[in-house]
Amino acid sequence: MVKVGVLKMGASGTALLVEYLLNERADRGDITVRVVTSGAKMQPEEAEVAEKLKAFDPDLVIVVSPNAALPGPKAAREAFEGKPVIVISDAPAKKAKDEFKEKGFGYILVNADSMIGARREFLDPTEMALFNADVVKVLAATGAFRLVQEAIDGVIDALKEGKTPELPQVIVTAERAVAAGNFKNPYARAKAMAAYYIAEKVADIDVKGCFIEQDPQKYIPLVASAHEMMRVAAIEADRAREIEKGSDSVYRTPHSKDGKILKKFSLMENHSKQ
């Protein structure tokens, strides 16, 4: 039994579902999971939630946050130095990539898990929820979540075998996400890539709207347009999956009870092991 600890700081699309990607039917017998979170806050003092996770004594620690280069997420992961740690974050965390390597941390950086348009004049709880729903659809339908899932499962498999795991060093680009999506139809693949690229660009617009522009007449339309872009990305990602449904070629990779990844394309066919 591998004990997986998940520490979440702040909000990101991947953080919403990461533990469920490992046990979608709640019937795996090879892992047990505990999750602690600091909620929306990411200040260094919030990293004290790591102490609660230490009591679980995890075999593998996953630290999920936006911009893992910030002091708060840094303090959280360093609390587990000496254990296998995987950092899951977004494109701005690339600034800390060399540090991750030096400290022996694995990383999965999801380019399309873009920051939200956090201007008070625009962002309310409803808008926040809708944006994250769109992000989740993009990451799920393009294949990005599968890439995250398989990278973590590889580490779990090594730990089950008593081996020292090789921690992932993955930047989830559009090409890598869509490869994991394993699309059969080239138009579905193209739509998935378009969705991912649009979602990536959302971060650039929101950075400008949240941190650069100071005039409300300029920054409000910017963050609103970024959210419209993510909505369009989610629509295109959904269309990609619908094309695959039409040809009965949706790629599925459920877990067996012993944690093995199964695979299938046709809806009615039996699974085979990867």
Where are the predicted features?
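Anaerobic metallocofactor- and corrinoid-dependent redox/one-carbon enzyme cores
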Residues: 1-58, 64-274
